């Protein structure tokens, strides 16, 4: 069940400046959990209890209930911890999330990240399958270096495989137009090389991944 005990951080569309372990002690605690099955099980169960705060948008099992909202299922735990930190510090802006994180303790953030990282992503409905080939070509040319060949991410970069197509399109379009509040130079520069049809193709490809 607890697949991430087999690696240290399977760490992964939204590139942000990393919050390194030296700046966030929760990364060290995540390391400890990875090395201790009992701690891991306790964190998972505690995270499952606290995830009720997230289910109305992200789903009980981390599979989004709205196309505009990202899946949290199978997301990299270090990335989720990083995002909690950014929402808390208002370095990432979302009225809903900025309020929710106020009600979370550091341990809540860690435990929720552990819980969602262990959930399975449900297959997405096919989105414009005729664009898959072009989307794969664009992904391999522009995205895989950071997000990995399977789009599972790495380090503190997110898993973008199996995300809802609407979410991918909206986010890439925001980066493209510099409206994205998290806009970071690397991601913005890449997004600005993509036209509307390119973005649709990338979304079609990422949505098709499992």
Spans of features found by a protein language model:
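Inter-heme linker and motif-flanking segments adjacent to c-type heme-binding CXXCH motifs
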Residues: 63-64, 90-93, 118-130, 145, ...
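Bacterial N-terminal signal peptides that target proteins for export
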Residues: 1-9
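C-terminal capping alpha-helices of c-type cytochrome domains
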Residues: 23-29, 33, 102-124, 166, ...
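Sec/Tat signal peptide C-region and signal peptidase I cleavage site
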Residues: 17-21
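Gly/Gly-Pro-rich "capping" loops immediately C-terminal to redox-active cysteine motifs
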Residues: 44, 62-92, 98-103, 136, ...
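Electrostatic cytochrome c docking/interface patches
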Residues: 22-51, 114-138
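The canonical Cys-X-X-Cys-His
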Residues: 54-61, 112, 142-150, 202
